Amino acid sequence: YIKVYDADGNEKSSTEIEQPQGEDGMELSLGVNSIVLDKDENLVCNVNIWGWGATSDSYFDEYRIMVFDKNGNKTADNKIENYLDRMYADNEGVIHTTQYGENGQEMVTVDVATGTFGDGVTIGETYFSTCFFNEDNNMVAPSGTGLYEINMKTGEKTKYMNLIGCGVSPSSLQTVGILSNGTLAAFITYYSELDQKSISELVKFKEITKEEWGNKKTLLLACDYLDSSIEQLVLEANRKATDYVIDVVEYVSSGEEEDYYEARNQYYAALASNKDIDIVVFSYNGYSSLQNFAKKGLLTDLTPLMEANGSIKKSDIFDSIVNICSMNDKLVALPTGFGISTLVANPQVVGNGESWTVKEAMDLLNSMPEGTKFTQYATRDGMLEDLIDLNYRSFIDIEKGKCDLDNEEFKDVLRFSALFPKEYDYDDDSYADPYEELGAGRTICDTCYLSDYSVLQVYERIFGTPGNYIGYPTSEENGALINMDGAIGITTNADDPQACFDLIAPLYKLRTYEDGTNMYSLPIRKDSFKNMTEKWKTKESYDTWYLNETLGELEMQPPTQEQIDIIEKNINNAIGVQGALPTEIKNIIMEEASAFYSGDKTVDEVTPLIQSRVTIYLSETN
């Protein structure tokens, strides 16, 4: 129905939207994607009609623009040939929508009388869920950490407002606009990871004077990109805004046109030079940068700050996390969460050993029937990168600036990685179900990400017995890699490091997991992990996974003590870290190793070259 109400909420008219009828018994559904008022105060509706027929290939899907007058009478109904995104009305009542043109995303005009599109302005690659038009009739849309104004004549983009500073996430905006009294308002929905619940709010913004601002101080948080948990922390702090507010500089903003690696380099350069930065975030693959800045003395020891705060102690944290985040006996960062990347195999194939060397793994693969794969999807560069991330301590000492890459152990790493394909062909006609291949022993291992108990039950079904989480081949005691969700540190330039830690401390509070959410990332606290495990054991319902035609469906069960022990053992014993080596060192190794892979040089010829180049790199960067 289209219903018209007066200002007091009394219904003035009601018009039924006719339910579309499909041919040959096809059942159609109708959905209204957006509603706007045009310059004549007609109601313009963006409608999607879709449905399935009796056969799988009989599918109907079309977009229409329906127009209703003030009394609810339909005055136009036009089919749109292309996908129609959400519509917006500017201050003159002209209707706009987004389309992709030759130069990227465009905001184009919509002729509601004919259902055709007019001229548009290129607005870049930024995706936005809502927008409004300001007093200059320019579009204002969320992007990065705030709202940006886009000139509707030139497409030029300028910062309009910092939303994060007001305690509102741009991604939470459902609608935003200027009320009749000139107030900027928005309807927002978001999930609070700190409160562990979904929240919907109507918010209004007010410009305040310096006197109203008072003596509040600003702390600057720098990040390559802002993940949801850290964003929630910033928003909560800024909403309270008692003594401090947190300003955010995001260098790699999703949806922006800047080159990713160039933006990352700008970010790391800023960390080294910008003395205004108080809090720094290293993303999931930024561990080598964390080491680099700690080595330069740019990160504060968090231990005394934790002791003064009192909400978390170093002894609360898994030792493996403390170890990888400690440099020169200082705890310089804490991840917001983590997972464990490892290899799992059938113990009937690899035995019950808890680790294996590269040579042992290579010998096993060479002893298997022809066509046996080590893992289903691993590539040459991918396996090489994982092995050097895991074994880097055996070959490279970042802190001392020394390396030993011209030895038999490293040569085995190159020999082993050479057994993998350069790239995996996903279109290969010889594709086989990975679970079938693993269960039959035609694939030795599978890459496994341990962040909850479900995956352990999957492999137990595949093998018919608990899997052996043997890890990647290594000379170390354990072959598991820690994948940090993101790590937070405090710079030595911070004027008030204690205030910085007090603001980030809620990220590390004891979690109860009462609502059963966010149970797919491991917490760094041992007591939170215990609570997470207890919640897994007492869930009201468990997911059912479909594996394949042979294995069928698998209904998850409460974890057994053996499964709990597997996760804990991998957490406690893991010493490798994803992203441990700088990209520059990995590139040197891969560049020189390519001559060995192609057969142009022997392994004995390439390792001295790798040793020489990495030595030069370490001396220059130290």
Spans of model-derived segments:
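Short, solvent-exposed loop/beta-turn-alpha elements that line the ligand-binding surface or hinge
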Residues: 300-316, 393-414, 471-480, 599
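Extracytoplasmic/periplasmic solute-binding protein
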Residues: 330-341, 360-412, 440-445
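Hinge/lid segment of periplasmic solute-binding proteins
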Residues: 285-342, 466-473
